[in-house]
């Protein structure tokens, strides 16, 4: 009997993406699997049921959940959805286990193997599975457009019959995937751009996009592709340099975020007060508490002279292509764990080991387990059991 891979309809209020698009469904079938979709799952992202060829469209969600060997989703599913899955099944979705402990417990207790897409390791061979990066690319692009529509001026220089209009000054803070895409987009739209990141190795990437790089003299390169926490002295040094650049910017996009953790503060109230009238900040860290003082997630607020936009789930605003990229990320993961139509989980494989959050009734992610069971329990389990002597 073939493995059944099913995608569900997302229930989040601001979620329009779907985990499976028609083209990818065809490629999954080539792996020797049956493919099913909850009725209407792709409509919000411009994929009607009729676009899914040779896919079982099922209206009974409970039946779909109980029969699927592998369940695909975008957002962390509810506990109720997990409890409706059959024991031994696999979930592939974003999980954010440190923030969704009830979900992880349900996965553990239901003996569901949970793959957390946000935990895909940042290694070369896993790039095609890196859902955080694929979604961040679209968020970075859209952030500049969002900022532009809130500005009282245009981005490019423009020559008119009555004179020339100056190009806007755009500062991108945080040059990860989202930041670099924002930088490239602002440059293509004609703005004068500069980028800042605490990791000096991003300097060349900024220059390659036609942008200046803000030099602070602080190196905060951390592990896993993310920046480390700055010391108090380093923060003061960085602030002194950045304040001038912030004050002269027309548009700032902040992108500093680490999945599942509080967003670092990049801009404070004093710096905002010295910004130009009509200036705009788009804070991509809004869901994690904000990179800017005064940011409100899901709202646009006026703070002194500046408008602060705190968008949530920007990839969902570009649902058609966000779904396409995410679905391809999942396909590449499935190709790692399905061979000749059979499930083959290699626990020694770095991608599998680091992406798993639960398996066989256990929490396999140490970081998540520490939050749920406590550091003492994790440490105790690492101590070998004493061996009886004859």
List the predicted regions and their residue ranges:
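Glycine-rich phosphate/diphosphate-binding loop of Rossmann-like nucleotide-binding domains
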Residues: 8-47, 156-247
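A structured beta-alpha segment of the ubiquitous adenosine-cofactor-binding alpha/beta core
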Residues: 55-69, 76-77, 223-252, 256-273, ...
């Amino acid at each position: 009997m073939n493995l059944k891979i099913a995608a569900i309809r997302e229930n989040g209020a601001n979620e329009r993406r779907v985990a499976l698009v028609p083209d990818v469904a065809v490629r999954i079938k080539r792996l020797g699997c049956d493919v099913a979709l909850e009725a209407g799952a792709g409509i919000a992202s411009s994929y009607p049921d009729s676009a899914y060829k040779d896919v079982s469209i099922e209206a009974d969600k409970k039946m779909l959940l109980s029969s699927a060997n592998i369940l695909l989703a975008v957002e962390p599913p509810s506990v109720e959805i997990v409890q409706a899955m059959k024991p031994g099944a696999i979930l592939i979705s974003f999980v954010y286990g440190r923030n969704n402990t009830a979900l992880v417990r349900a996965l553990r207790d239901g003996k569901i193997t949970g793959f957390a897409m946000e935990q895909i390791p940042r290694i070369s061979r896993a790039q095609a599975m890196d859902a955080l990066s694929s979604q961040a690319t679209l968020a970075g692009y859209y952030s500049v457009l969002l900022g532009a529509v809130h500005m009282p001026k245009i981005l490019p220089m423009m020559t008119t019959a009555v004179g020339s209009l100056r190009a806007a000054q755009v500062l991108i803070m945080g040059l990860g995937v989202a930041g670099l895409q924002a930088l490239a987009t602002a440059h293509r739209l004609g703005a004068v751009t500069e980028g800042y990141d605490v990791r000096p190795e991003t300097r060349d990437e900024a220059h390659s996009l036609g942008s200046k790089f803000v030099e602070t003299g602080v190196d905060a390169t951390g592990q896993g592709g993310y920046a480390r926490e700055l010391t108090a002295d380093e923060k003061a040094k960085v602030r002194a340099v950045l304040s001038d650049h912030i004050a002269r910017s027309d548009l700032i996009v902040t992108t500093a975020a680490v999945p599942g953790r509080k967003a670092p503060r990049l801009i404070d109230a004093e710096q905002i007060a010295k910004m130009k009238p009509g200036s705009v900040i788009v804070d991509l860290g809004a869901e994690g508490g904000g990179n800017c003082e005064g940011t409100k997630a899901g709202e646009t607020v006026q703070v002194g002279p500046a408008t602060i936009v705190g968008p949530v789930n920007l990839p969902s605003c570009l649902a058609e292509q966000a779904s396409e990229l995410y679905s391809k990320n999942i396909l590449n993961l499935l190709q790692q764990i399905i061979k000749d139509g059979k499930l083959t989980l290699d626990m020694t494989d770095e991608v599998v080991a680091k992406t798993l959050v639960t398996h066989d009734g256990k929490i396999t992610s140490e970081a998540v387990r520490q939050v749920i069971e406590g550091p003492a329990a994790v440490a105790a389990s690492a101590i070998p059991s004493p061996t009886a002597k004859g």
